[in-house]
Regions:
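SF2 helicase/translocase NTPase motor core
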Residues: 1-50, 54, 71-72, 83-182, ...
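Inter-lobe coupling linker of SF2 helicases/translocases
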Residues: 131, 137-138, 142-161, 176-193, ...
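P-loop NTPase motor cores of the ASCE clade
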Residues: 337, 365-368, 628, 643-847, ...
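Amphipathic alpha-helical coiled-coil segments
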Residues: 888-908
Length: 939
């Protein structure tokens, strides 16, 4: 025997055990993903993620947890697991305003990099002549907006994605209507991919919403729309149990009431500060309003390509700060001066205002004019100059004075409730951000930190450099992520006020801050919800105060706040705007456009009020009492007593994570042996001059994180799998193990033989199993669990020659029996999948037949009505026309009955063919590989 320096047999076991491909919805399947992620485990999120893996024959699922329960995290687990299992490609379709948040969440919580595919990114490839640039994107995860997915439907359809995530999937609920162009294009683009739909509102207006959303996953779930209407709308009460049964196979829903044991929900407390503009501020406001109202088609003031966007920005800046207004107006004036000199009409520089909604961003357009009207352009330059001079004469801004009052209230309130004295201020303008920072520092608030999309100011760079010095391992992570971490860390430890812009704050998790100030208020309700959600989220210990400012001299601003507060209920619900309210909003930008129209067309307060009255009526709660009852009745059927179930999930998940951690640490030691220094207490080690720590213990990112998905983790698995040793002798050193293993203690001094096989099964899914068999010299069998426990111990290992057949024959015979049992268990599980799929196909066949029957029945009713009509008609010509219609209809009915028999036969043939195809997929292939066969002793 030759003694080995390391532990290759232990390494081979650990690397195989930690990398096993698992099928179905066992927690073991996602244990590596849970271990490697940076999420706070909640049982309902684990349960939802496992639901997506429950049946390999399904084409997708709907995750319909109530709002605020973390559907993004659930999807993140599914995405990470898809990547882990097969380096799969994933496409995420989300509202444009949520794309960056998705990118941030995947990066920070799952260490997954992604690409946002917007028009600019796509065109950069398309202009170089590439036919389908999507195929060239190196990232495995692509994020697109609904609009972009619709526009690129053919390109996306022709790509190969292993998974499609659709966020806010209720936007597709009208897909059965041909007029819903975007919905149908998205459905077409993603048709062949496995899908996970995320929505808190699977039913919004009526039960057809369910039909539409389910059809995005699979058109055969409910079949014909007329059958759905007949069974589940017209005869709802009789068929509710059947509808519930069908839904439970495809939809998973958790209610807030079910998770209160695990998640503490805090309240939102709205606080409003009113202020009055002074005369000069009012004059500036009215001058800009007049400028917008008077700028016609022939004006040079606003480029046609930016018309909507510039009006939107100017209207919003009127509620922000004078500095932001002055900066934008000067940009507009400089552009006019350049146009006057060159005759070229270029777009306005909008760098101050963070625009990330792609449909507002046009490609750069340069217009040329045959002749510039010098008089008109001079008048417009003079008008801008006069407004700029007026704005520059404002010494003290009334809104800023209100901010000072609010801060005085804020810090007193935070001190009173025992919360950390920290305030988050939001603005949509970088210039307003700079203005607030300067003025607040002047007025005694020294601990002010800025965060925006660039953070290239001196103070931010200083914060970043200081943070990097204390977190050297983070130098390998992207600068944007590190900057975000540095700002959060500084704000948590030393900051008092964080002033953030819209785009910069996406993905910020500030649970330690419980006071949010909207210095200027977005008109998009979803944007407001995202702002407040930075603080009002899981982990928040206090009620969150949300402060808004209202200009009591400005009717438009008052009505905007009224709309957001009363109609969308953003500021005072436990989890913010309810799923019913925001779920019914097709797109927050449609509200923005409506408000821009009011600014652009209404001149008097009466006109403004009338327009807002109409707008409020448009967004009134259109959920009827009847549909609300149906929603509650149907969705409540998903609510069960799940407390013990959730407790069991959490316990099982923690056990799986602990086992993953143990295997990973043992794998590391068995590969490197005494070659590297270890700290077993803190799970720290050093390789090639770098210090690493198990990722589950690396909370402060001071060390490089070590997980199976890290580069080092992949390298170690590769080394372990490269060991060619199959035969040897292993000494398990129980005396070196610091914990007591009672089942192992009994084996001290025993000798025997052990074999490890890997069984690979390829059926609906690929799955792998490790099968241990061990026999002591006295003939005692050792079970799988004890064999696994033995490899927790450090070993001394030797290479030997193969063993004689007579020595290991009983061991190998036992092994054959156990391997056969594993294959049989897999077959039973897959037969269950097969039965479920056959049941679904039978329901589909019934729907098809019923569709023809309903059509015939409808014609019979129509014929009866015509016969009654004929009896009442006295005019012979009219009577003859009706009788001809009856004859035609009777022939059609007779023909339909004949066709029904053919249809039944055709459907039955289709059903048999589909079942045959499923059976072919289920025809399993299995492969058995011996990992090692060793003699052993326990010392």
């Amino acid at each position: 025997m030759k003694k080995l320096e390391n532990e290759p047999f232990a390494a081979k076991y650990c690397s195989n055990a930690i990398s096993l491909k698992r099928s179905g919805s066992s927690i073991e399947r996602i244990s590596n993903t849970l271990y490697s992620s940076k999420i706070t485990m909640t049982p309902h999120q684990i349960d939802a993620a496992l639901f997506a893996f429950k049946s390999p024959t399904r084409k997708g699922v709907i995750l319909a947890d109530e709002v605020g329960l973390g559907k993004t995290i659930e999807a993140g687990i599914i995405i990470a697991q898809t990547w882990f299992e097969k380096r799969g490609k994933v496409i995420i379709v989300a509202p444009a305003s949520l794309m960056k948040q998705w990118q941030s969440e995947l990066s920070e919580k799952f260490n997954l990099e992604s690409v946002i595919l917007d028009r600019k990114y796509y065109n950069s490839y398309a202009k170089r002549g590439y036919i389908n640039p999507i195929n060239l994107i190196e990232s495995n995860i692509i994020i697109v907006s609904y609009q972009m997915c619709s526009a690129l439907k053919d390109e996306i359809r022709n790509c190969r994605f292993d998974l499609a995530i659709i966020d806010e999937a209720h936007k597709l609920r009208n897909v059965y209507n041909e007029k819903s162009i975007t919905s149908n294009n998205v459905k077409y683009a993603l048709q062949s991919f496995k899908k996970v739909l995320l929505t808190a509102t699977p039913i919004q207006n009526n039960l057809l919403d369910l039909y539409g959303i389910c059809s995005v996953i699979d058109e055969d779930i409910f079949g014909d729309i007329n059958v759905f209407k007949y069974n589940y709308i017209k005869n709802y009460d009789e068929n509710i149990e059947e509808l519930e049964h069908r839904l439970k196979s495809v939809m998973h829903r958790t209610l807030r009431s079910q998770v209160q044991q695990y998640i503490k929900f805090t309240n939102r407390i709205p606080k409003t500060f009113y202020f009055e503009q002074n005369d000069i501020e009012t004059a500036v406001y009215e001058s800009i309003r007049k400028l917008l109202l008077d700028s016609g088609e022939n004006s040079y003031l606003i480029p046609k390509s930016q018309k909507h966007l510039i009006v939107l920005i100017l209207c919003k800046l009127m509620g922000s700060s004078m500095r932001a207004i002055i900066y934008t107006l000067k940009n507009m004036r400089n552009r006019l001066i350049e146009t006057k000199q060159t005759g070229i009409i270029e777009e306005i520089n909008l760098e101050d205002y963070e625009i990330d909604d792609e449909e507002y961003v046009e490609s750069s357009i340069i217009e040329t004019s045959a002749k510039i009207d010098q008089n008109q352009i001079n008048r417009e330059i003079e008008t801008l100059t006069s407004i700029i001079e007026l704005a520059e004469s404002v010494n003290e801004e009334s809104k800023y004075s209100a901010l000072l009052q609010s801060l005085k209230y804020s810090f007193a309130h935070l001190k009173k409730i025992g919360a950390e004295e920290k305030v988050l201020i939001f603005t949509e303008s970088k210039r307003t951000q700079e203005f607030l920072s300067e003025r607040l520092k002047r007025d005694g608030y020294e601990k002010v930190i800025l965060y925006n999309g660039s953070n290239n100011d001196a103070n931010s760079k200083e914060i970043y450099n200081e943070w990097i010095m204390n977190h050297p391992a983070s130098s390998v992570i992207s600068k944007n992520i590190n900057m975000k971490s540095a700002i959060i860390d500084k704000f948590r430890k030393d900051g008092q006020i964080l002033i953030a812009t819209e785009a910069g704050a996406e993905g910020l998790n500030l649970q330690f801050c419980s006071l949010v100030i909207n210095y200027d208020l977005p008109w998009n309700p979803q944007r407001v919800e995202q702002r407040i959600g930075r603080c009002h989220r899981f982990g928040q210990k206090h009620d969150v105060v949300v402060i808004n400012f209202i200009n009591s001299t400005n009717v438009v601003e008052q009505r905007i706040y009224e709309l957001l507060n009363s109609k969308f209920r953003l500021f005072n619900e436990i989890l913010g705007s309810s799923d019913t309210v925001l779920g019914g909003l097709e797109d927050g930008k449609d509200l923005e456009r409506s408000i821009v129209d009011i600014y652009s067309t209404c001149r008097t307060n009466e006109e403004i009020n009338n327009a807002f009255d109409a707008l409020q009526d448009k967004y009134k709660d259109n959920i009827t009492e009847s549909i609300q009852r149906t929603k509650e009745e149907l969705m409540s059927n998903f609510e069960e007593d799940v407390q013990q179930y959730f407790t069991d999930i959490l316990t099982s998940a923690q056990l799986c994570i602990d086992e993953t951690e143990r295997l990973l640490w043992r794998l590391l030691q068995s590969v490197y042996g005494p070659l590297i220094p270890y700290d077993d207490e803190n799970f720290v080690f050093e390789i090639d001059g770098k210090k690493y720590r198990l990722s589950s213990k690396n909370c402060d990112n001071f060390y490089e994180s070590f997980s199976l998905n890290s580069k080092l983790g992949e390298r170690i698995v590769e080394i372990a799998n490269s060991y060619k040793y199959q035969y040897g002798h292993v000494v398990f050193n129980i005396s070196d193990y610091k914990y007591r293993l009672s089942r192992i203690d009994k084996l001290l001094g025993k000798h025997g033989y052990m074999v490890l096989h890997k069984v690979s099964i390829d059926s609906f899914e690929k799955e792998e199993h490790l099968v241990f068999n061990a026999i002591l010299d006295d003939g005692t069998r050792i079970d799988q669990e004890v064999c696994e426990m033995l490899f927790r111990l450090k070993t001394t290992e030797y290479i030997t020659s193969p063993f004689t057949d007579s020595t290991v024959r009983p061991l190998l015979e036992d092994s054959k029996i156990n391997i056969k049992n594993v294959i049989n268990q897999s077959e039973e599980k897959n037969n269950k999948f097969l039965s479920e799929e056959i049941e679904r196909l039978n329901l589909w066949a019934d729907d098809k037949i019923q569709s023809v029957q309903l059509e015939v029945e409808q014609m019979r009713i129509q014929r009866k009505e015509l016969q009654q009509q004929s009896d009442l008609v006295s005019n012979s010509i009219e009577k003859e026309n009706i009788e001809n219609q009856i004859i035609k209809l009777s022939k059609k009915i007779k023909l339909s009955w004949l066709e029904l028999a053919d249809a039944e036969e055709e459907v039955e043939n289709q059903r048999k063919q589909m079942i045959s195809n499923i059976r072919k997929v289920n025809s399993r292939e299995s492969r058995v590989e011996m990992i090692f066969l060793v003699s052993f002793e326990i010392a």
